UniProtKB/Swiss-Prot annotation:
Source species taxonomy: Eukaryota, Metazoa, Chordata, Craniata, Vertebrata
Positions where Phosphoserine occurs in the chain: S651
Subcellular locations according to the entry: Mitochondrion
Species in which this protein is naturally found: Mus musculus (Mouse)
Official protein name in the record: Protein adenylyltransferase SelO, mitochondrial
Alphabetical keyword list: ATP-binding, Magnesium, Metal-binding, Mitochondrion, Nucleotide-binding, Nucleotidyltransferase, Phosphoprotein, Selenocysteine, Transferase, Transit peptide
Length: 667
């Protein structure tokens, strides 16, 4: 269990948001319905979990509507409450897909592949049985989706189970995602399917081991129950298996939790369900700050009002969010659905849907095929997060004056993002001794070179980790570096026109004949981008593979010379250059992951799981627990062979067919 202990230690360094279970109270004594009081199977492996459901004690919970038990899930507005009671809907023959040992270790659990453990996990983590002390509920929140206020949203497919207090003094909220309908399910069924659940399960854990603040995933349980899904929204629905993910975090409260008080929006006309309930906003703020920002609460106990406390809270949320998105940019992570309801109030990556990691570097990469306007491209993520913080600032008024919040946002976000981003990029480039003003320009030119050559984001940084600081083997290194650039076939596929030529021609004619109408339609950006694609495609058609290779080498030789010049400045005054080089390489390898959850890796695991084979999910999970591991660390012929196999299977550039993979909001 050494790896588990190490993971627990690492988690303490990454998640700064963990509230302590000080003065542990008995589980909530709130009245429980007949179904909650009914006899449940007795857990054995999970028997030691102690629940203390503070959120339900300290925040308003909706009084269940009169009627039968199944009326708990009747879709309805939920005014004057932060939670509604819920009940997981049973699944037919639940079966464990995988457990995450490091995530479950947070709860004091030792995971294993013993049949009894897997059976118990499948029973309780599917929602088919409830652990003693759990109080299932659904959280009420609103959100701005793709820039427009959508009104009440809430946990339509997720359920709060309760909060586990551990022997280490930590408190963790447990949540089942995909456990069935709630009052917030609207017209949906409250279920998630196998493909989307595997993606969330694997990416939650992958992000943690990359060192990025994130919610965790302890288990993935599938079943023989099915639901209909139209994966690509093309009129071809199919049945898919219902699956549940056990999610773990200090809290799942989000920016949108504070938007339930929003008056009717001037654009959409929608309002939050608790307009005018300033008392609940105060209650929610008090709960969040005292529970998850206790140092801020303690620093402002003598204040005559809470404005300075709330300002300090907003400042910290702003800084955490800036650092989080900076970390995303440094590993090429694209979230895909950065709505305000998908932004954690404690600065964690939350709600993994149509996410993706960059393969070929493209600043305009759209990982979510449902994002037709490209609102959430890779390069726009920092500014979208800042926009979401602006909406949080508006939601906190009058408890925090908007002018003060906006001043904090203007002062903190861009500065903190740039500081953290450049600090991380310096480590990725092995610039460990001195900081130079031109480092930002060097990074920008690196990304420009990667874009011009279609370089693989993850693998390019890995190759740079072995860059010779002297002039030895420079030709061999350049060959290895350019081998990570996209082939001519890949580029032609990537830049193929996406708009029917006749439609494009009509749009161009409209732009000439009636520019006002063309502007009103709002397709100018799309047409401009399509023209750029057509032009790029035309240039590619005139290139030969050897021409492309020569251009790539020229681009990289130019940047590598600047990089070498910067390294020369880095080692000025160094006495032991060998020790400096060794430390530089060590830092680079510790900050440039070899393995990320590429879409094609996830897809292969999903396809195997859909055929009843969960071994690939478990294999990928173990691989992602050591993303910075390199084959140089392997010892012995068997270990080296295994490492080499993993290298070729999981760290190569994606196959050509991976470019056709399409991920949407369908889940």
């Amino acid at each position: 269990m050494a790896s588990v202990r190490a993971a627990v230690g690492a988690s303490l360094a990454v998640a700064r948001t963990r509230p302590r279970c000080v003065g542990l109270a008995l589980p909530s004594s709130a009245p429980r319905s007949a179904w909650a009081a009914a006899m449940e199977p007795t857990p054995r492996w999970l028997a030691g979990l102690r629940f203390d459901n503070r959120a339900l004690r300290e925040l308003p919970v909706e009084t269940p509507p009169p009627g039968p038990e199944d009326s708990l899930a009747t879709p309805r507005p939920v005014p004057g409450a932060c939670f509604s009671r819920a009940r997981p809907a049973p699944l037919r023959r639940p079966r464990l897909v995988a457990l995450s040992e490091p995530a479950l270790a947070l709860l004091g659990l030792e995971a294993s592949e013993e049949a009894e453990v897997e059976a118990e996990a499948a029973l309780f983590f599917s929602g088919n049985a409830l652990l003693p002390g759990t109080e299932p509920a659904a959280h009420c929140y609103c959100g701005h989706q793709f820039g427009q206020f959508a009104g009440q949203l809430g946990d339509g497919a997720a359920m709060y189970l309760g909060e586990v207090c551990t022997a280490a003094g930590e408190r963790w909220e447990l949540q089942l995602k995909g456990a069935g309908p709630t009052p917030f399910s609207r017209q949906a069924d409250g279920r998630k399917v196998l493909r989307s659940s595997i993606r969330e399960f694997l990416c939650s854990e992958a992000m943690f081991h990359l060192g990025i603040p994130t919610t965790r995933a302890g288990a993935c349980v599938t079943s023989e129950s099915t639901v209909m899904r139209d994966v690509f929204y093309d009129g071809n629905p199919k049945y898919e298996k219902c699956t549940v993910v056990l999610r773990i975090a200090p809290t799942f409260i989000r920016f949108g939790s504070f938007e339930i008080f929003k008056p009717p929006d001037e654009h959409t006309g929608r309002a939050g369900p608790s307009v005018g309930r300033d008392d609940i906003r105060v209650q929610l703020l008090d709960y969040v700050i005292s529970s998850f920002y206790p140092e801020i609460q303690a620093a402002h106990t003598c204040d005559t009002d809470n404005i300075q406390r709330n300002a300090a809270f907003f400042r910290e949320v702003t800084q955490r969010t800036a650092r989080m998105v900076a970390e995303w940019q440094c590993v090429g992570f694209c979230h895909g659905v950065l709505n305000t309801d998908n932004m954690s109030i404690v600065g964690l990556t939350i709600d993994y849907g149509p996410f993706g990691f960059l393969d070929r570097y493209d600043p305009d990469h759209i990982c979510n095929a449902s994002d037709n306007a490209g609102r959430y491209t890779y390069s726009k993520q920092p500014q979208v997060c800042k926009w979401n913080l602006q909406k949080l600032a508006e939601a906190l008024e009058p408890e925090l004056p908007l002018a003060l919040a906006e001043a904090i946002l203007k002062e903190e976000f861009d500065t903190e993002f740039q500081r953290h981003y450049l600090q991380k990029m310096r480590k990725k480039l092995g610039l460990i001794r001195v900081e130079k003003e031109e480092d930002g320009t060097l990074v920008a030119k690196l990304l420009e070179t990667m874009h011009l050559t279609g370089a693989d984001f993850t693998n390019t940084f890995c190759v740079l980790s072995s860059f010779p600081a002297d002039l030895s083997d420079s030709a061999e290194f350049l060959s290895r570096l350019t081998s990570q650039c996209a082939s001519l076939e890949e580029l032609r596929l990537a830049f193929r026109p996406q708009m029917d030529p006749r439609q494009l021609s009509m749009m161009l004619m409209l732009a000439q004949s009636n520019p006002q109408l063309f502007a009103l339609i709002g397709t100018q950006a799309n047409v401009t981008k399509e023209l750029e694609r057509v032009e790029h495609q035309s240039r590619l058609e005139q290139l030969s593979p050897s021409d492309l290779q020569r251009k790539n080498r020229d681009h990289w030789e130019a940047w590598l010379q600047e990089y070498r010049d910067r390294l020369d400045k880095e080692k000025e005054g160094v006495g032991d250059t060998a020790a400096w080089q060794a430390e530089r390489v060590r830092v680079m390898r510790a900050n440039n992951p070899k393995y990320v959850l590429r879409n094609y890796i996830a897809q292969k695991a999903i396809e195997a799981a859909e055929n009843g084979d969960f071994s690939e999910v478990r294999r990928v999970l173990k691989l992602l627990e050591s993303p910075y591991h390199s084959e140089e660390e392997a010892t012995g012929p068997e270990a080296v062979a295994r490492s080499t196999e993993e290298q070729s299977s999981y760290s190569n550039r994606p196959p050509l067919w991976a470019a056709e993979l399409c991920v949407t909001u369908s889940s």
